[in-house]
Structure formats: C-alpha cells, structure tokens
A protein has these predicted regions:
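Transmembrane-helix signature of 12-pass secondary carriers
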Residues: 1-426
Length: 426
C-alpha cells in the first residue's frame, strides 16, 4: 500500500465530490442544448449551418479549454485551476440565457465549452491522484457517472420549464449557471494534490515516492510526443477520438432522433430521453464493479465491441419507432463501459508531471471527433438515411476496437507509479 493510499478518507471523499460535481455540470450544460436547439432555431430563425454551429459550439470550445487548462494544471497545480474553470460555467451560462442572436449565443456557448473542456483533465486527474490504487476505478467511474445524472437533471428542468413557452430554454441555461456557483466556493477550499507537490519537489518525505518516480524523466509538454510516451498519447487520443465520433454524433441528437423517428409529442421525447439517460447510469453502476475485477482492457474491448455490434445491427434491421428507446437505452449502458475507460486511461498512463496535460490533449483530440460526429450526423441522415448513418458510426467503433486490441494496457490494482509510462522503457 502506497503513501497515497493512506490519505485520510475525508480528503478522498472531498476530492470525489468536487470532481463529481464538475462532471454533473458538464453533463447538464452539454446535454441541455440537444432539446433546446429545436426552440432556439425557430425563435432566432437560424439556418441549418447556424443550428449545427450552435449545437457543436461547446464541443468546439472544449478543444481549446482542455489543452489550456490541462497544461495550466500541471504548471500551477490542480486545486488552483479547479475553481477557475467553473467561472466559465457561471458567466457564460448567464450570457447564453440572455443571448438575442446567433453570434451572441454561439460565442457564449463556445466560451462555456472552454470551461467544460478545462474541467475534464483537471477533475479526472485530481480524482485519480487522490484515489487508492485498489479501488481507484470505482472512484473514477462513480465520479463520471454524474455526467448522466446531469443529463437527467437537464431533461427534468426542461420538463418543468417547458410550460413557460418557447422562451423556456433561457431559464434552463440560467439554472445551469446558478448551480455552478456553490461548487466554485467549495472547490477553492480544496487542498493541493500531494502527487503534484511531489512531482514539483515541494513535498519530500522518506515515506513518499521520489520526485523522479513521479515524473519518469518527463520535464515538459513536448515530452508527450517523444519515445514511449508518444505511443500512449497516440493510443488514448485515437481511441477516444473514434469513440466520441459515435458517442456524441448520436448522443446529442437523441431528442431529435426520437422526435423524427418515434414520437410526435415533446413530452414523449423528453420521457424517452430520460429513460435513455437512466440506461447510462445503470451501465456505469455495472462498470464500477467490473472494471477493477475484469480489468480496464477487457471492459474497454467489451464496450467497444457491443457498440459496434448494436450500431451495425440497428442499421441493418432499420430500427425505428418506440423500440428506439430500449435500443438506445441498451446502447448507452454498454457505451459507458468504453466511455469510462477512454476518459480515465490517460490519468493512469501519463506520469504526474504531464498527467493533466496528457489528459487535456487527449480530451481535445476526442472533442474534434465529437464535433465531426455532431456536424456530419444530420448530413449523413439526409444524404444516406438514418440506418446507414448508424452503420457508419458502428464502423468507427470497430476501428477503435482493433486499435484497443493492439495497444490497450492493463492497469488494474496498480499504483500510478507502476502504470505510468516514462521516456525510457521500464
């Protein structure tokens, strides 16, 4: 048992809570647009291109936020950045609610995305560094499952505010901004990660790992693209990119898919979307108990394999109607197995000195995939049809599955010193 495994339980729970709260807000703010865009499009008279840009704007912002805040987290510390990124949630959530035209809304959602993107590497790195090695994945999976709780809450708030009329979406955006404020106040009181302090030579003790054991010979950002670390960077970025093409390409359109191919009523669409979200939470609960026993590699391969099979079969049989709800509920449940591993693999494979930077880079690349999926899905549905589009996304999952077979490393029940990769082969 390492020194970090012996940290007080209260510290671990506090870090888990503040990280989970970040993922909750991520899920809320990213998901809320998927239903609201239908009303925004009509209110502002958006063109199809403008509608696509508004829908994808937060994902575009995440590309830049993940790299920036991931790098800053390695430079100045995890705790200092955790409060700053949520300021973006509060400020630009409010400006989104007050937007009067396409430009204002696009810029507001883009800058909101910068904060969301920044929270991914910082929150995931922090929870990984505070969690005990024997049950690290339960902490990690439990925290990211809050993303789908945020998604469910966004649907619930939409349901409650929908009677207000076409302007309801402004209140939904405002709610997301307001709930971020108390979380900011809690985060600014969080202690710094001991691992980060060791990596900087600030914290030294005979019971602690040596500074060189934490850093593995890596000194800066560019070392992510050298030697053995380059292979890790390529693996986590490429697989996550391919996963997000399908995950976000379909996921942000669940309400629109249900409206187009299943239900005519807005309320039926909302209920269907909430059922799908419950499926995701069930998937995370199952994954939480399996990943530390079966291992990351097995769960990742099973998740990607199930996604591939379901998407391709769904396209072949041309699935439609109310059956889409249990179909997508099953899909997202198994999708979370792969999703949890792709999200947290970088935190175990990169050493402390560039853990947040590596996570930020991988997040950024994954969001490029998400933007491509979100942008091209409606185009593919129009030109190729819904069923063929499912098959195309299924193929991206097959490619991710193949790369994972070749490159996925098992890290279960090992300390971060054991799982992280340095410039030289250990």
């Amino acid at each position: 048992m390492s020194y970090f495994d012996k940290l007080p339980k209260g510290v671990k729970i506090r870090s888990f809570f503040v990280s989970s709260a970040g993922f909750f807000l991520d899920g809320y703010d990213l998901s809320v647009i998927s239903f609201a865009i239908y009303f925004i499009e009509h209110e502002m008279g958006l063109s199809s291109v403008e509608t696509g840009l508004v829908t994808a704007s937060s994902l575009i912002g995440m590309i830049f936020g993940a790299i920036l805040f991931g790098w800053l987290s390695d430079k100045v510390g995890r705790s200092r950045i955790m409060g700053i990124d949520l300021i973006f949630f509060a400020v630009f959530g409010i400006t989104s609610a007050l937007s009067q035209n396409f430009i204002q809304l696009f810029i507001s959602r883009l800058l909101l995305g910068v904060g969301i993107g920044g929270d991914y590497p910082v929150s995931s790195t922090l929870i990984a560094e505070f969690s005990p090695s024997i049950s690290r994945w339960r902490y990690l999976t439990g925290s990211v499952s809050m993303y789908w709780v945020g998604t469910l809450v966004s649907a619930l708030i939409t349901l409650l505010t929908l009677p207000l009329g076409a302007y309801y979406w402004r209140w939904v955006f405002l709610f997301g901004a307001l709930i971020s404020i108390p979380i900011i106040l809690i985060r600014i009181r969080l202690i710094e990660s001991p691992r980060w302090l060791v990596s900087k030579g600030v914290l030294k003790d005979s019971n602690l790992p040596k500074q060189e054991d934490e850093n593995k010979g890596i000194k800066g950002y560019l070392d992510l693209f050298k030697g053995n670390v380059l292979l890790v960077t390529l693996f986590v970025s490429l697989v996550w990119f391919l996963f997000d093409v399908a995950s976000y390409g379909i996921g942000l359109y669940y309400p629109l898919i249900l409206r187009e191919f299943a239900f005519p009523s807005n309320y039926e669409v909302l209920y269907g979307t909430m059922v799908i979200g419950i499926g995701a939470i069930i998937g995370y609960i199952i994954a939480e108990f399996l990943i530390d026993s079966l291992g990351r590699r097995v769960v990742l391969l099973f998740g990607l394999g199930a996604m591939s099979l379901l998407l391709i079969l769904g396209g072949i049989v041309k699935i439609f109607g109310f059956i889409l709800v249990p179909y997508f509920m099953t899909f997202v449940a198994l999708e979370q197995w792969a999703g949890a591993v792709t999200l947290f693999y970088p935190t175990e494979l990169f050493p402390t000195s560039v853990r947040s930077s590596g996570q930020g880079f991988a997040t950024s690349i994954s969001r490029i995939g998400a933007v491509l999926g979100v942008f091209y899905f409606p185009i593919m549905v129009k030109d190729l049809g819904f069923s063929t589009s499912l098959i195309v996304f299924g193929i991206t999952c097959v490619i991710a599955f193949i790369f994972s077979i070749l490159m996925a490393k098992e890290t279960k029940r090992k300390t971060l010193e054991e799982t992280s990769v340095g410039l030289k082969r250990s």
